Amino acid sequence: MSTQQTAVRAIIFDLGNVLLPFDHGKMTQQLAAVLQADPSELATFLFGPDEWFLKLENGDFPLDEAHRRLCERFADCSLDAFANAGGDIFVYDEPMHRLTRTLKELGLRLVLLSNTSALHIDYVRRTYNTLEPFDELTLSYQVQASKPDSAIYRHAIGQAGCEATECLFIDDRADNIAGAEAVGLRSHLFRGIGELLPWLRSQGVAV
């Protein structure tokens, strides 16, 4: 006897390397240029044992304070130069944007769930139309929790306005998929739109 699959009412998407490919190496090089810093020294500062960049994404300090701290550590630059150098790390993905628009037209609720900072989400907002189809944004620096912490998934489910079993979750990291499945989300490890579309259809989404 087959069991009936719960109908999908909402889809929760990751941002980086799902909706928009990105490159932290590009960010490091560009920030190094405006801060007059050695790229390897800056990379260690951002991503080394102190986890400075993870703290920024987790909302431990705001963007203007991040700018001040980096200028104190390296060299002065304007906030605009800092924001552009740090934010310009994405590549626009038109097929994924078309997909999210289609899903929205199907009547599904769309939620973005991203470990991100104001540095990156503000750049995406002012540069691309990627976020237009989304009903809600669950952003780590605002929630002050990051994937795979269960708290941020539960926040996104709340924004979806339905049960976890009625949501799908899409992310490019296996640890984030495991965290999502632990709270009851049907999840897909993203490896490109070519694998995503058949999975969505297998979940009853007519794309």
Residue map of PLM features:
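Asp-based, Mg2+/Mn2+-dependent phosphohydrolase catalytic module
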Residues: 2-9, 13, 117-207
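N-terminal helical cap/lid subdomain that shapes the substrate entry/recognition surface
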Residues: 4-98, 105, 117
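Generic structural signal for small/hydrophobic residues in well-ordered secondary structure
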Residues: 14-17, 59, 103, 112, ...
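Alpha-helical elements of Rossmann-like donor-binding domains used by nucleotide-donor carbohydrate transfer enzymes
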Residues: 26-30, 51, 65, 69, ...
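Proline-centered loop/turn at the N-terminus of a beta-strand
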Residues: 109-111, 186
